[in-house]
């Protein structure tokens, strides 16, 4: 029996299908709902702390779900972590996200934000690393972790490989920082899961995803990942991440992932 649990991100279906998906999640043994905050609260999501608390209670009491992760945490935000003036404003916004996550008892926030981490010629890694150190300190204060996700060159030009994300988190050694292990990045970059066995202890959340967030395909890497996570005693969530699709595709995906990972 695996120590980890299963989740799916709510970016994968239309809002009107929420309850149908929640029912299918229960039937497939999923216990986590990963959320994009603006999917729940379209405007200024982090100002809705009371509503977040109520939403978390509804998920737990009505459906038995927790919120293991938040993604798209900077949706609609401009600015760049390599620019100190932008970084200060983005850090303030991230602190609001941490407080929101804390209200939901959500332990991990995915840092993808590819557009906000484009490195211009002459930009120093030190600026980005200073941002992450400050963000990690804030995350720890709220009892959450910022999970840094590698994104392929089709999205950004900083932290493209999974190895780079692990290297950064290990180097900064901040209790508020972790890695979001994203299978679509591994696939796009041609990386091998077995190369990261010793690094899995730095992972706070896992995405089962395809390049371009296409619907999940059946792959041998899924079983390999399930075995690796079981072997190292990973206790977080394995979460399906895909772009919005139809209800039947979501249901088929839930059943497939449950079959492979449970």
Each PLM stretch: what is its role?
Residues 36-57, 113-119:
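Glycine-rich, proline-tolerant flexible connector loops at the mouths of alpha/beta enzymes
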Residues 1-7, 68-80, 114-116:
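N-terminal small/glycine-rich loop or linker at the start of catalytic domains
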Residues 12-14, 37-39, 73-76, 115-117, ...:
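Active-site-proximal loop/turn and secondary-structure-junction residues that shape catalytic pockets
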Residues 19-20, 61, 79-178:
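Active-site acidic/histidine proton-transfer and metal-coordination neighborhood
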Residues 49-62, 130-139, 195-198, 224-228:
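Catalytic-core regions built around general acid/base machinery
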Residues 2-7, 15-31, 90-91, 105, ...:
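Histidine-acidic metal/acid-base catalytic patches
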Residues 52-82:
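Short hydrophobic interaction/assembly module
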């Amino acid at each position: 029996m695996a120590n980890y649990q299963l989740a799916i991100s709510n970016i994968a279906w239309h809002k009107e299908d929420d309850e149908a998906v929640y029912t299918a999640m229960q039937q497939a043994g999923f216990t986590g709902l990963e959320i994009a905050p603006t999917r729940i609260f379209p405007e200024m999501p982090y100002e809705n702390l009371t509503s977040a608390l109520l939403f978390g209670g509804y998920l737990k009491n009505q459906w038995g779900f927790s919120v293991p992760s938040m993604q798209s945490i900077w949706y609609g935000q401009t600015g760049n972590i390599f620019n100190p003036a932008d970084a200060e404003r983005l850090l303030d916004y991230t602190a609001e996200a941490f407080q929101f996550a804390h209200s939901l008892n959500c332990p991990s926030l995915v840092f993808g934000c590819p557009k906000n981490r484009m490195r211009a010629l002459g930009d120093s890694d030190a600026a980005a690393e200073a941002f992450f150190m400050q963000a990690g300190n804030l995350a720890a204060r709220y009892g959450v972790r910022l999970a840094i996700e590698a994104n392929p060159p089709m999205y950004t030009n900083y932290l493209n490989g999974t190895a780079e994300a692990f290297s950064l988190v290990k180097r900064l050694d901040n209790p508020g920082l972790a890695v979001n292990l994203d299978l679509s990045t591994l696939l796009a970059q041609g990386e091998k899961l077995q190369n990261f066995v010793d690094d899995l202890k730095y992972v706070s959340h896992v995405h089962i995803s395809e390049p371009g967030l296409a619907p999940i395909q059946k792959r041998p890497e899924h079983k390999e990942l399930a075995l690796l996570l079981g072997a190292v005693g990973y206790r977080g969530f394995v979460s399906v991440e895909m772009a919005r699709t139809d209800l039947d595709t979501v249901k088929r995906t839930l059943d497939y992932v449950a079959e492979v990972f449970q």
